Each structure stands twice: as C-alpha cells, then as structure tokens.
Amino acid sequence: MKKFQGIFTVMMTAYDADGGIDRRGMAAMTRYLVDSGVHGLVVLGSNGECPYLTHGLQKAVIDAVVAECQSRIPVIVGINERGTEDAIAMARYARSAGADGALAALHLFYPLDEDAVFAHYEKLCEAVDIPFLYYNFPGNSHLLLTPEQIARIASIPNVVGAKETIFDVDEVRALVDATDDDFSVFTGRCLNLTQTMEVGACGAICPLPNVMPHKAVLLYESLSEGNREIAAPLQADFYTVGPLIAGSPTPHALIKEAMRQLGHDIRVEVKSPLPQLTPQQVSHVHNTLVAAGLLDD
C-alpha cells in the first residue's frame, strides 16, 4: 500500500508586516485546505520560497502548519539544502515537530555523479527516521537523473515516493515501471494529472490547489474511478488557471495574489531576491481568475 497518494497542496508561505512568518495566516490556510478535502499538505516546497528562508523561518512554518493540522491529513516538509549535514538537521526538526514526511531535493552548486547523489540520500535516510520522497525538478535543481537512477534511490528503505516536476510523461511511466507498487510517484503539475495518472502516477504535489482545492480533489477522484466524463472538464479548468504558474519562472507572488483576490488574508510579498508583484501581473491574475470562472469581471 502506498504511504502517500492524492492531492498534496504545496502551501504558500505567509509573512507578517515585519517579514516574519504569519502564524495565523499559515493556520488559516491550513484550515481552508484541510476543510477543502485535499489529501495532504507540503510546506517549504519550491513554491513555499524555501531556498530563501532562514532555518528559523522554516521552523516557524513547520510548527504553525503541523500544530493547526493536528494529524488530520499528512504534512510533508520540503528539505532544500545544498549540504547533507543541513539537510539532516532540517529533516530531524521536521520529524521532531510532528511532520509525516520529507520531500528532499538536492540543489547542485558543483556537478555530482550518481554515486555521490545516492550517498547523500542514503546518509539522509539513515540519519532520520521519517518517510522521504525524492524531488525530481531538474529545471531548478540542475540535477538530472534517469528513471533508473531515481529507482536506485527508491531502493533506500525509507524512500517511499518521488515528485516528478517534469513534462515528459514517458519518464513518469518509466519510473512507475522501475519501482515497486507501493512506491508513490506524484506529478508536480496538476496540468498533466490526467496524463500521468494514466501511466501510474498516484496524484499531484502542486501549488494550484491553493486556488481550486475542491476541483483538484474531484479531478483526482474522478481519474481514480476511471470517470473521464467528469475528469475532462475539470482538467480543462486547470489549463485555464495554468497561466498563474506557466507565465513566470517565479510564480510565487502571482499565486499569493490569486489567493488574495479570492478572499484569503495573505500578504503578496515574497522573499528577496524573488521578484515582487507588478501592476501588470495583478491584472494578469485577475483576468486569469475571471477566465476560470472564479471571479466576476
């Protein structure tokens, strides 16, 4: 049986006026997503601005979400450290705080061969007793492994899944085929949830369910039941909101602005050096939400 499956929302990180973590805001987003029926939460993912948060801010995010969630659904913590020692330290904190899993990326500064990458994950998993997911995001991490190489990492005992933020559905299929049935292969994009579930993916780890959580859950459930008649228009709805993430390599502020326009009390500021929202992007977000039927013009 798979440890994790379904719609896991990559949460945005909410700040207060002083740049600290808005714990009330994080708690409110947690309640909203849990009540919307998503199957899990991911904090400190790539859309949670993790690479630009101090360890203190990261810990505050973990604490706020785990405390509010109260084990109603799993909370997975993004581990995005360049060095193995720091990755171990943050994974240990996540476990001690009550998180249910860790999504571990390895962002390269120096090129590493397959054995060095494997050794990093092996040391991480040996040091911390928590379920790990491998994060395959070559566009950001600059680490490009084949499905067979990822399957080798999957052989480490407490690696239970992988997030595949890639466009090639055949690579997702190859990873599914190369791993055991209880290994959870997630797509990192709701935009290809239909195609990836057709080849064996077990759900999505994605930020777009912040905007349409109910539809994301219904899309997943419809695909799981083989009901393409219901799934097809829901998948099309995600294509409509796709410009929120597809229109920028740094969509963090756009997604926050979408949430703000939909009534969530969240500041749209992001951590430097991420770009702040422009007036043109505010209009772009509004027009996208109108086109998706989520706002009136």
Show where each model-derived region lies:
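Short helix-capping segments at alpha-helix termini
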Residues: 67-73, 96-98, 128-130, 155-158, ...
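Alpha-helix N-capping/helix-start residues
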Residues: 17, 23, 55, 147, ...
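Active-site beta->alpha loop and helix N-cap motifs at the rims of alpha/beta catalytic domains
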Residues: 2-9, 14-144, 259
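Catalytic alpha/beta core domains of metabolic enzymes, predominantly
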Residues: 126, 138-239, 245-246
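Short secondary-structure transition/capping segments
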Residues: 53-56, 89, 114-117, 145-147, ...
